Amino acid sequence: MSVGETTSAPPTPAPDSDVITSTFSLVDYVVFSLLLVFSLAIGLYHACRGWGKHTVGQLLLADRRMGCLPVALSLLATFQSAVAILGVPSEIYRFGTQYWFLGCCYFLGLLIPAHVFIPVFYRLHLTSAYEYLELRFNKVVRICGTVTFIFQMVIYMGVVLYAPSLALNAVTGFDLWLSVLTLGIVCTIYTALGGLKAVIWTDVFQTLVMFLGQLAVIIVGSAKVGGLGRVWDVASQHGLISGIELDPDPFVRHTFWTLAFGGVFMMLSLYGVNQAQVQRYLSSRTEKAAVLSCYAVFPCQQVALSMGCLIGLVMFAYYQEYPMSTQQSQAASDQFVLYFVMDLLKGLPGLPGLFVACLFSGSLSTISSAFNSLATVTMEDLIRPWFPECSEAQAIMLSRSLAFGYGLLCLGMAYISSQMGPVLQAAISIFGMVGGPLLGLFCLGMFFPCANPPGAIVGLLAGLIMAFWIGIGSIVTSMGSGLAPSPPNGSSFSLPSNLTIATVTTLMPSTSLSKPTGLQRLYSLSYLWYSAHNSTTVIVVGLIVSLLTGGMRGRPPNPRTIYPVLPKLLALLPLSWQKRLHCTSHCQDLPVDTELFPEKMRNGALRASGDKEPMTEASPVHQGTSPTFILHETSL
């Protein structure tokens, strides 16, 4: 079956008399309320525990003492948004299981951050990922990266709060602004008062709720249609089970190559350089714990993706046996799954409430991460560098005030989203357009020692211009033809680089159209290649400008900010080849300069020498200007 096609016809709608009236029972309201109560209680507990003794490090980085498992679940929850929970099943229902191959990109998409980005960030003892840009380039590049990230996340958090609330209101009659205000206020309170530790532990709780809610739908739905075997048989009979589509054309929406390799760049923009994720790595007790938490996300992501796909298959099998109402058949894609769940779980008190709790757990986890990361970068990148004399107490109060301020801004953005109408789709897509250029900026600095500040700035601007040109062009072209666009840099499971793009992607038609030409051909580039395209633009333009402006002009970059790509690749060769290439001739005899990795506080300030972290084997250390890199490991 080719991508975007399905051999099955939609089930015949039932008469209008069968329209579903989805109402919550008292038990459902209790289950949903417990989610809010427990989330708030976790935040207040961490806020009250040690009140008056908190430090900025505790508030923003959980005092760098978090374990592997909570960090891993928080990494998963951060971009497992509510719209993703609605978007994946709808994608599978409409287009088949081709989307499941996105799971193939998770391996490289998490392996590279674990062994490239985490070691560099962790050993620099950063608080903000954008502090790296100042250490590698200069303060101007740091501010450019920070402002770009703030723009991305401010749009993201308003839409991720409003969109699922709107879908829930349309299906269940749940008051729209009551749910928006309740979620926004609860999330703001526990994030601002409890800091990152509260956010991580509420993410753990909310992740469990998300899994339970989806599992309930799978169990009840498969039982009603005769079991998972029957679900699979029905899907196979109707051509919903997709084979591997090996078409290399990057303009085809979903193929194996697009999902498995284009998705890698999307994952890198999320799990490699996004502040919300980097902050969690840096909160780990040790570098090893940070790496293990990144590994642990892999099976969790596979489970989350598989559950979403299963719900889509169960939904398809269910509607082959039970006719849907006209109201359901005409529903928007972000409402379609909710109609199915309310139809499926009616008469089972508590389960509709559990799924709604699952849905809003996705919203809470993503919004709280946005608040916390925005407060962190604003404090560390825009305020502290200009007010270094700010006391600890003032910094704590300011950090909490920033989180509260971003919470109010989130509510304002939710209101603006409600007024945007069709433009909302463009606002959603902006999040995905920004992820690729930011990834390219970090890769430019980390992998290319010749890159200089002018190259970084011009490269970032070129990447953003290219991203918005193609992304907005795709939206306008699709609107002009009456079709939903293929959103940039999105995927149904994670939205940062995708957000509610998951919902938008499912609106694509199931029939092939004539091939576009000219600029329309460029605008039809698969959204999963956007991160790769835009990050490559930043790197290529950045390198050209850097070379034209003289590179680093004899001022080599700080070796701690460069990832030694060539020595790492040479290390993969057989030992005999390494000896012939003379890449191991003297690496065992050089001394380790522990001063190259002093423990650094915020904004480049160094701790007293007595507080430095001891060095043992394992960390990649560049010995002065020598081209040789030696492996050492910090005792973390």
UniProtKB/Swiss-Prot annotation:
UniProt main location, coarse: membrane
Reaction catalysis annotation: biotin(out) + 2 Na(+)(out) = biotin(in) + 2 Na(+)(in); (R)-pantothenate(out) + 2 Na(+)(out) = (R)-pantothenate(in) + 2 Na(+)(in); (R)-lipoate(out) + 2 Na(+)(out) = (R)-lipoate(in) + 2 Na(+)(in); iodide(out) + 2 Na(+)(out) = iodide(in) + 2 Na(+)(in)
Keyword Transmembrane helix found: yes
Localization terms from the record: Cell membrane; Apical cell membrane
One Gene Ontology MF term: symporter activity
Location of the region described as Disordered in the Swiss-Prot/TrEMBL record: 606-627
One example of a Gene Ontology biological process annotation: iodide transmembrane transport
Glycosylation sites: 489, 498
Superkingdom as given in the UniProt entry: Eukaryota
Membrane topology, record value: Multi-pass membrane protein
GO CC list: apical plasma membrane; plasma membrane
Keywords noted in UniProt: Biotin, Cell membrane, Glycoprotein, Ion transport, Membrane, Sodium, Sodium transport, Symport, Transmembrane, Transmembrane helix, Transport
Transmembrane segments: 24-44, 68-88, 101-121, 143-163, 176-196, 199-219, 256-276, 297-317, 336-356, 404-424, 428-448, 456-476, 528-548
Record remark: domains: The C-terminal tail is important for biotin uptake as well as apical localization in polarized cells.
Annotated family: Belongs to the sodium:solute symporter (SSF) (TC 2.A.21) family.
Role played: Sodium-dependent multivitamin transporter that mediates the electrogenic transport of pantothenate, biotin, lipoate and iodide. Functions as a Na(+)-coupled substrate symporter where the stoichiometry of Na(+):substrate is 2:1, creating an electrochemical Na(+) gradient used as driving force for substrate uptake. Required for biotin and pantothenate uptake in the intestine across the brush border membrane. Plays a role in the maintenance of intestinal mucosa integrity, by providing the gut mucosa with biotin.
Subunit structure: Interacts with PDZD11.
Descriptive protein name: Sodium-dependent multivitamin transporter
Natural source organism: Oryctolagus cuniculus (Rabbit)
Gene giving rise to this polypeptide: SLC5A6
